[in-house]
């Protein structure tokens, strides 16, 4: 369907209230990478908010592949899979006023990160907006409502940075507004990769893959709490996400990280991650 005809009702719960869950997928060789993990997260999130997706995992998989085939898309594609609670009879929060099935939208676009971003990296700015606590809006939910992250993003680009670095309610580093954050610390022969303890961030697919890559290749890595002091003193830093994979960080709050260029650990992890993606899509068979 042409994008100008792709519309939803103004009474849709996603439009009215941000009531829904979603996933972003990268496609290579005609296959969505790590599809099972993304569907796991989607269905777990939907169950947590009592949202009936209305389609099976297989039906969603077939719909994704059908969309890719209809648009002749094989490489360099980003897919956004969105599920909302559906159309309501009136603008109101209560899910019981929903009058139809869940709304499912698949947006597939040819979209790739700029090569310079992947090699030269990005800049971060620490915002005053904190990651929410699990008893307010659990950060583990990949919900449509992203206003907390959007406000942080606005603060970051207003300050001249590419993305926001966000702290948890206790002042430790949590994540960025749309990616996960890692630092490389220690001497050359004792380098260690650190990321947050995971309590205040989305259960990132790429984040998990990076930790598994480290374990498989003898690279010390762990989830822990650390502060901005550790960030400013880090040898390297990088962010992870489905769209761009692994991206180096040049500076945080105007403080140069390392020598301000992509470091050897980031370059190594980028290569290992690319191998993992290639292996995953090569093993897939389209339905």
Go through the PLM ranges and name each one.
Residues 1-165, 169, 202, 211-287:
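Conserved alpha/beta cores of soluble small-molecule-handling proteins
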Residues 208:
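N-terminal G-site helix/loop of the GST-like fold
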């Amino acid at each position: 369907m042409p994008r100008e005809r792709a519309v939803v009702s103004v009474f849709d719960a996603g439009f009215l209230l941000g009531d829904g869950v979603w996933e972003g997928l990268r496609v290579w060789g005609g296959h969505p990478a790590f599809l099972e993990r993304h569907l796991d997260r989607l269905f777990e999130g939907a169950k947590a908010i009592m949202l009936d997706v209305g389609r099976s995992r297989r039906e969603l998989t077939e719909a994704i592949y059908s969309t890719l085939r209809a648009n002749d898309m094989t490489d360099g594609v980003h897919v956004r899979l969105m599920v909302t609670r559906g159309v309501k009879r009136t603008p109101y929060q209560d899910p019981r006023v929903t009058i139809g099935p869940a709304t499912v939208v698949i947006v597939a676009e040819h979209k790739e990160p700029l090569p310079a971003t992947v090699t030269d990296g990005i800049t971060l700015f620490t915002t005053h907006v904190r990651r929410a606590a699990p008893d307010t809006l659990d950060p583990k939910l990949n919900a449509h409502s992203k206003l907390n992250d959007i406000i942080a993003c606005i603060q970051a680009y207003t300050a001249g940075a590419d993305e926001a670095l966000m702290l948890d309610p206790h002042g430790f580093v949590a994540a960025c507004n749309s990616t996960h954050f890692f630092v490389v610390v220690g001497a050359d022969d004792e380098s260690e990769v650190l990321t947050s303890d995971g309590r205040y961030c989305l259960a990132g697919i790429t984040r998990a893959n990076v930790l598994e890559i480290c374990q498989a290749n003898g690279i010390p890595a762990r989830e822990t709490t650390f502060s901005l002091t550790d960030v400013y003193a880090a040898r390297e830093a990088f962010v992870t996400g489905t769209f761009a994979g692994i991206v180096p960080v040049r500076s945080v709050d105007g403080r140069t990280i390392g020598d301000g260029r992509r470091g050897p650990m980031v370059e190594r992890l980028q290569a290992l991650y690319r191998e993992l993606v290639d292996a995953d899509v090569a093993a897939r068979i389209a339905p």
